[in-house]
Amino acid sequence: MPFAYSSICTTLGWTGYIAGTGRLGGVDPREMAKSDLVVIWGTNAVNTQVNVMTHATRARKERGAKIVAVDIYRNGTIEQADLGLVLRPGTDGALACAV
């Protein structure tokens, strides 16, 4: 595995992802703890990705990082974010281009 840590969830997830795509890409989620701004887009990480929120909240606590959440409905992540953007379905592409 490309990352220095693993769990039963990540090991199984990475194995399935690699089987489907041929390779694992992306960044190490632990890098979020070193960020000044964490953007969580299109997922309710508070309720479904505890590992993501652990690193995001660590960045907030240790570095004063801001958390921005983007989704099409209000959820736990939007509620905990410093800035929560609730978009109409299909409009997030325009936001991505504008950023």
Where do the language-model regions lie?
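Catalytic alpha/large subunits of respiratory electron-transfer oxidoreductases
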Residues: 1-98
